[in-house]
């Protein structure tokens, strides 16, 4: 365990909203506190509305903390870097604690990010990503401070255009507010804080990293967290206290950060050393891709390093004048801060690269054969990462400003005239504390457990301070992904805080015409109306599956703005036409490379898939309005939806084929259009049956891939065909066979010329939705009324003869234990709310508690 990890371990093994972090003897304990949620701007920065408004923001004198003239401005998506030099600062306050002072309570934030300790004990890192108008701060209670001298210390950095694309910023700053007993000693702007600049930290190429995840780093000296400035000076106030007390008749807002208390728990801080080193070589160049041989899997350094990882030895030594490359299989996908403790060694350097998979040395592909993700012989490890150069006299403890991710690590080590002692190495796993609280099992299909395992891991790896499409690329929220992810979270856990946060962030980012950002938060904005439609579906999902009416009511202006904005793009017939931006639908083999359905681009006219999503958005809006008591608004969307449905049938329905075409020319047909039409109830029942029959039998339809299979599976279960769902899971079964520990972005495929194409990403949580369907489809547990006050259990088990499931509910869990035989069900349903059980002609009322099914 590194010196840096040791500080964290003293503080916590897993950070949660309810547990005090255990401390070592004579060290303080830290407890997260949640300030009352505020969902509107209100008087923020006009009046003092919270304790932190009495604190000032600090920075280093002489540094503007802002983008300089001639630099690439925030908002550019180019990858050519900028002129801004990242700055890393350390703020310090030495203070005295007296008898009777009691617990210390602090509110803390920074721009861009901070790492905070008290007497060397880890307190927190943050803040959670957001917009300047919704800047986040956290609150902590620090207990056990004995009389005497203590130190609060924060490492704060502003990377600017070399930070991940999702990192927004106003200017550099640090703010901390202490409770009354400690106010004069600790509150920034009241107490004296020292600040110093840390040296030896510089970006090292590819400043957007792996497609938007930030710079790689070259760090020389002692490391970001433990390094000391060469000189200290008094920190200066760069923005004074926000707002004023009492009435403010002019309503003027203080510029800059508008602070809101974070409502999501801290990220996990688990120190781990997973997996094992599987190959070692002295033949690779510095940070060079090297194809490993079988002999290199048996090199003596393999066993020696694995003994070191297992704690059997206290150090791993690389001799003087040596080049060594190690291939480390982490065993499963992980998001973590790398941590390594290096001894003093003049001329030594240590590189730590991360990648999702090994690549074959012959064709550079990851491969789809069984066990491909675990293979190393004949393969190389690429990826991206960081270089650490220890102080020649003192060594150093190294980590990175932001987490790294993947299933594989490649360590490149080079020494000069002195040996390098690696004193410790570990990972601090970082993610939202989302755990699998639900359950599903059937002895009839063992593969379902494996599919749940990789789906859950994918969801965990894409859930952090905000949701990600994927952790290796972009690290941004995309509404199409997010809508699916939110329902996966609903199926995994009763915790709805990330669900609310995601919808909130999109609401904060909508444009003046109601369009939701295609990717958000971001400095490199994209537009796409089809994803605005996906954003609108999240409201109805929340209204049905969760219970916070007050929160949903506060978000209603966002729903209404975007719904009204979509109406601006209707033509004279009421159809959406010439939508702005990228009308992405799915990565479909046979469509153009950009994933847009035929007729979906600007200037191409009208398209069925986009208009059918608009139908679903109207259903979602009507449901949400009605759930909140706005019947007039709900009827407006119901009536408008009926008119749109009729026009869609008139324009796109091909009676000869019993299918919806993608365009009025009726030459292109997709599973996507049929699914959306059937889910939107645009056809009468008899024609819907015809459409469904052709959906499952016509082999020339363009097929849904990983993401859009969500809508396909919803359609299967709407028509009671759990057997089709189980069959279509073969793609996920192949993931397991390949050795994947998460779900991919898209299927691998071969083009008409025999060229092989692979999924870009090995971890995309839009493919985690089988978890949702096992519980809501196979087990059939669904909300039957807004805010989940009623349940409908209507299992569609396919060929399963028995199943057991546990599904989250705002008041607990709904559990089923069922057997199926000759079209009859038997077993048990336990529920915290009343409802109905439906199967094979049976319709049984469910009461609160345990219900026998016979």
Segments predicted by a language model, with ranges:
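Helix-terminus loop motifs that line ligand-binding clefts
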Residues: 125-130, 357-380, 493-596, 730-754
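Active-site acid/base region of carbohydrate-active enzymes
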Residues: 182-195, 408, 416-454, 460, ...
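Solvent-exposed loop and edge beta-strand segments that line ligand/cofactor-binding
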Residues: 80, 327-330, 398-399, 467-479, ...
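Non-catalytic C-terminal accessory modules of carbohydrate-active enzymes
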Residues: 210-211, 216-221, 639, 726-854
């Amino acid at each position: 365990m590194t010196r840096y990890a040791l500080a964290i371990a003293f503080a916590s093994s897993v950070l949660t909203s309810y547990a005090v972090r255990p401390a070592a003897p004579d060290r303080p304990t830290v407890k997260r506190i949640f300030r009352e949620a505020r969902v509107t701007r209100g008087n923020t920065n006009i009046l003092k509305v919270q304790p932190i408004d009495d604190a000032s923001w600090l920075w280093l004198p002489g540094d503007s903390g802002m983008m300089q003239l001639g630099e690439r401005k925030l908002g550019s998506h180019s990858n050519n870097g900028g002129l801004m030099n990242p700055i890393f600062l350390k703020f310090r306050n030495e203070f005295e604690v007296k008898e009777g002072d009691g617990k210390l309570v602090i509110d803390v934030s920074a721009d861009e990010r901070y790492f905070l300790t008290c007497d060397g004990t880890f307190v927190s890192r943050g803040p959670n990503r957001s917009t300047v108008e919704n800047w986040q701060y956290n609150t902590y209670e620090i207990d056990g401070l004995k009389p005497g001298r203590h130190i609060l210390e924060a490492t704060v950095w502003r990377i600017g255009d070399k930070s991940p694309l999702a990192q927004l910023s106003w200017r550099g700053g640090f703010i901390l507010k202490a409770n009354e007993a400690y106010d004069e000693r600790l509150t920034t702007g009241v107490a004296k804080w020292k600040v110093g600049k840390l040296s030896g930290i510089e970006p090292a190429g590819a400043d957007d990293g792996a497609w938007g995840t930030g710079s790689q780093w070259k760090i020389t000296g002692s490391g970001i967290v433990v390094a000391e400035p060469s000189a200290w000076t008094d920190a200066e106030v760069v923005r004074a206290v926000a707002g004023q007390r009492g009435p403010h008749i002019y309503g003027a807002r203080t510029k800059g950060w508008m602070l809101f208390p974070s409502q999501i728990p801290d990220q996990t801080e688990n120190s781990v050393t997973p997996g094992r080193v599987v190959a070692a070589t002295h033949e690779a160049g510095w940070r060079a891709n090297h194809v490993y041989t079988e002999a290199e899997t048996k090199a003596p350094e393999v066993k020696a390093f694995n003994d070191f990882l297992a704690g059997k030895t206290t150090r791993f030594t690389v001799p003087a004048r040596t080049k060594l490359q190690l291939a480390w299989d982490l065993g499963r996908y992980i998001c973590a801060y790398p941590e390594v403790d290096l001894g003093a060694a003049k001329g030594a350097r240590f590189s730590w690269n991360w990648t999702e998979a090994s690549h074959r040395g012959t064709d550079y592909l990851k491969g789809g054969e069984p066990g491909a993700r675990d293979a190393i012989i004949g393969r190389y490890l690429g990826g991206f990462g960081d270089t650490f150069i220890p102080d020649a006299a003192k060594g150093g403890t190294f980590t990175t400003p932001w987490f790294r991710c993947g299933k594989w690590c490649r360590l490149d080590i080079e020494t000069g005239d002195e040996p390098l002692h690696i004193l410790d190495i570990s990972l601090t796993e970082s993610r939202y504390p989302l755990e699998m609280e639900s359950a599903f099992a059937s002895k009839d299909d063992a593969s379902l457990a494996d599919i749940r395992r990789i789906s859950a891991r994918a969801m965990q790896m894409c859930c952090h301070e905000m949701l990600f499409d994927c952790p290796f690329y972009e690290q941004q929220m995309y509404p199409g992904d997010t809508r699916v992810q939110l329902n996966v979270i609903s199926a995994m856990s009763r915790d709805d805080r990330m669900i609310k946060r995601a919808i909130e962030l999109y609401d904060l980012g909508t444009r003046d015409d109601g369009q939701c950002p295609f990717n958000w938060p971001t400095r490199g904005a994209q537009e796409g109306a089809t994803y605005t439609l996906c954003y609108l579906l999240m409201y109805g999902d929340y209204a049905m599956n969760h219970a916070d009416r007050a929160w949903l009511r506060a978000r209603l202006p966002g729903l209404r703005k975007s719904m009204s904005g979509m109406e601006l793009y209707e033509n004279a017939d009421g159809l959406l036409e010439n939508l702005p931006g990228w009308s992405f639908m799915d990565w479909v083999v046979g469509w153009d490379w950009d994933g847009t359905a035929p007729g979906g681009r600007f200037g191409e006219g009208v398209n069925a898939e986009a208009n059918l999503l608009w139908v679903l958005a109207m259903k979602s809006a009507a449901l949400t309005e009605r759930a909140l008591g706005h019947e007039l608004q709900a009827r407006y969307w119901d009536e408008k939806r009926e008119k749109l449905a009729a026009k869609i049938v008139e324009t796109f329905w091909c009676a000869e084929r019993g299918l919806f075409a993608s365009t009025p020319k009726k030459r292109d047909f997709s599973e996507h259009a049929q699914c959306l039409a059937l889910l939107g109830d645009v056809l009468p029942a008899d024609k819907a049956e015809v459409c469904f029959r052709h959906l499952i039998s016509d082999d020339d339809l363009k097929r849904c891939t990983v993401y859009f299979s969500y809508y396909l599976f919803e359609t299967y279960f709407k028509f009671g065909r759990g057997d089709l769902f189980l069959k279509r899971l073969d793609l996920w079964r192949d993931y397991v066979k390949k050795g994947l520990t998460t779900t991919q972005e898209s299927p691998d495929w071969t083009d008409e010329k025999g060229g092989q194409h692979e999924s870009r990403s090995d971890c995309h949580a839009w493919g985690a939705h089988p978890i949702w369907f096992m519980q809501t489809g196979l087990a059939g547990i669904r909300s039957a009324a807004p805010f989940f006050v009623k349940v409908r259990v209507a299992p569609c088990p396919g060929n399963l003869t028995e199943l057991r499931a546990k599904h989250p509910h705002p008041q607990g869990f709904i559990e089923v234990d069922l057997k199926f035989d000759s079209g009859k069900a038997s077993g048990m349903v336990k529920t915290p709310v009343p409802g109905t059980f439906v199967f094979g002609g049976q319709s049984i009322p469910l009461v609160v508690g345990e219900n026998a099914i016979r």
